[in-house]
Structures are given as C-alpha cells and as structure tokens.
Amino acid sequence: MTVVTRFAPSPTGMLHIGGARTALFNYLFAKRHGGKFLLRVEDTDKARSTDEATQAILDGMSWLTLNADEEPVFQSKNAARHVECAEQMIANGKAFKCYATPEELQARREAGEAKRAQGKQEGLSEADRNGLLAEANELLAPYRSPWRDGGDPPVPDAPFTVRLRAPDDEEIAVSDHVQGDVTLKTREIDDLILLRADGTPTYMLAVVVDDHDMGVTHVIRGDDHFRNTFRQLPIFAAMGWDIPEFAHVPMIHGSDGAKLSKRHGALSTLAYRDMGYLPEAMNSYLVRLGWSHGDQEVFTLGEAAAVFDLAGINKAPGRLDLEKLGDVNAHFMRNTDAARLMALLEPEIEKLTTLDVGLTERLQHALPTLKERGQTLPELAESCRFLWDSNAENLNKKARKALREDGIKRLSELREALDGADSWTIEALQGVLDAYCAAHTLSMGQVGPPLRAALTGGLPAPDLAPVMYWLGRDEVLARIEKHLPATGR
C-alpha cells in the first residue's frame, strides 16, 4: 500500500501556524513511508472563500517547502462527482429525499428549547418536570427525518435536501492513532444532509468523496474534526469504500494554556516570515510542538522525515512558546551559509539604511561573527547598525562618560597609532591596541571604552579589532576625529 496523506485547508483566511503544523505532519508522514503528500483546497464555501486566501495558503506552503507531490485539487471543481455519489446512495437506499423545511426544523428546535425551559421552572411535580424534559430531549435529539423510510412529498415539486440514512441503533467505532479507541452510538448522530436544497454538496459529503477519489490512506487533521469522523464513516460505509486511518492532532494553545489567540502569537505563517523567521526554523519548531522523538530538540526537514511517526504525537495540546521559537530560529541563522544569510538580511538592512557597495563589503566580513547576535533577521540587522552609523549624535550615558578628558587624550593617541598601522588586519589592529596598552601601562578596560564610544556611540558591537577591520581605516579614523575637537570644550 502506498501511503497517501492530504492537507485540506479552507481558503477563508490565511494559513495559520495550526494549519501549517497539520500540513507538516501530513508531509512528514508521507515522506517517512515513501508515499505521496497531496493538497486539497476546500473552497466549496463560495461566500467566504477568496482568491487572496488561496494564494496566501499556497505561498505559505511554498515558503515552508511543504510541496505537494501533485497539483492542488480544488474541491469546488468536483461538485458533479459529489452529486453523483449522493444519487448513487439514493438508488441504493442509503440516502433519501427529505422535504422538511428550514422553518420546520427551526420550529422544532425552538419548541424543544421552550419545553426544556418549562421543565426547569420551580413548583413542578416530578412527573411534570420529567415529562417536559423528556419532550425537550426528543425534540432536541439528533434529527431523524420522517422521510427516511420513504414517502411522498407534501406537495408536488416541493424542495428537498438529500440526507444520509443514519444507522438505526448501532455503534460507530474509531481507532484513532492519537485519540485512541472511541465509540459513539448512532442515535447520537442525525440524518446527515448530503445535498442542500439548491443541489450543492455539503462539506461532509465532499470530504469523504474527495478523500476516496484521491486515494487518501491516512487522514491527519486537528482534533476539532474528531466528531466529524463519526458522521463521515457512515458515508464511507454507504458507498462501500475502504476507510482511511485517522490521527486527530490536539490544538495548539497559548503559553498560558488558553485557546490560542493573536496575543499568544496566532498569526499567519507568512507573518512569521515577515517577522524574520526562517522556514526551516518554523518547521523545526512546529514539528516539536506536540510531537517528540527522544531528546532531540532541533530537526531539519529531512531529519524529521526520517523518523516521524504518529505514535510520537502527544494527546495533550502543545503550547506556543515564542521564546523557544526564537532560540530555534537563532540556531538556524547561525548555521545558515553566509551567502544565503546575506541575501535574507539585505531587505532588512534596506529598511534601515541605503545598502551601497561599501556597506555590503562590511556586512560580508562581519556576518560570520554578527550572526550570533540575533534571534530574527530584523534583530540581526539592528545588531549590524554600527557598521553604517557611528551614533555620534546620540551617545548613551556610558559612551559620554568614556569620552571625557582622559578618554579623549587616549583617543587622540590611539588615532595616531592606528593611522601608522602597517596593515589593516584583525591581528595587526589587535597588535596596535596591545602595544598601546603596554607602552602606557594601561589595561584594555581603560583603553577600550573611549575607542568603542567613538566607533559605535554605545551601540552593541563585538571586540574592537574586528570592528575596526570591518569599518576600514578611513571610517575608523573619521569616527575618531569626530570626537577629538571635544577636548577644547
């Protein structure tokens, strides 16, 4: 058997991280077993589905490199096939035409709610209370249509829906890879609508038909769909189709255990891209958010695909931890090759300054060191600010203190020593600093602060010798000179 999984988003909004994790689990399971990973866009809700959301889903999948093995299936294009299957079930006695109107069904619900409210009133005898609540329960029970065993329409050409005839008094058993073995009495499900009164197929019918026609062997989805499984299995049975295996994955919660919301970080996948996270970091973080494999915390996509299994999915909801995501992203930034990291960083730098040839060269020299200094691309870009900004007009308190009297005197002497440096390498520049300290019986703790203040204005930066090498001789001398006139103030 070839394993076939599918990710089936509805294009009514962006691809959020919960959906991205579901897609990832489906992708990894298929790759682990040498199978196929498919994408189905469930766009049957024409009122809410948009082309923009569809494109955002496709873009999010592409960014995460979760590429489907076949072209996407658009559910709306299969409507004729869905109707055909409903008609086949009518012919086989598994489905029927129901002439109950929406108004009648609404009246039934309202009557049931009214009986329930009456049954909760004070002053009733136990017999009256029980009678009212029994009537309420009957009216509010899953709907069994009076036309389920046949019958003529109330009037000629009366509108109708097509409903699946729910099994009478049986148990539906689901053996779920995550939720375990669960059974449900069929009296707890209604005669499910397959075709609406306008002839369009419902979600429940479309999902089952498409899963069968696409050859899906494993349905891996959020546990908010778990109860739907008990309504979908009778459709498989009515059509005489093989039933796929199921794995219903718990939802992602916020760090406080509450339902995930925007304040927790419930953003679209592309929003995380725009915030400076790498796709490999998102994949690594999401795969560990509700799945475990030994003590390994960080995975490449290939590493995860080699070991991913359904048994490792936790039954409890995962909790979104943005600090942990930042740590994972920092790991992947540190391990990204210089050329790719430079390409990713350039747009962030351009948001802050003009990226000319000189700055590009400085960045290329500095990145192997500076890439340790941020958790996201914008943070990394900000840590590079000293490469183009001396911050001379916005010195912090520590920098201003370092540039008083003795500091300015040492800065003037250092400028002369640096101007006379035979070569401009990190080693040579460190030698100049060491020689100056030795000649004046000073420590680097006394010499470094004024020089750092002049070069970076208090902006965070690494060791001075590399900083001077990256800036270049002319820029270093110019930044020092900018502060030397202060001696006369």
Where do the protein language model's features map onto the residues?
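Non-transmembrane alpha-helical segments in soluble domains
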Residues: L58, A86-I90, N283-L286, A305, ...
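Active-site cores that bind ATP or allylic diphosphates and position pyrophosphate for catalysis
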Residues: K97, T101-H248, H253-L260, S268, ...
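Long, amphipathic alpha-helical coiled-coil segments characteristic
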Residues: A399-L429
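Helix-rich, typically C-terminal accessory recognition domains appended to large enzymatic cores
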Residues: T425-L471, E475
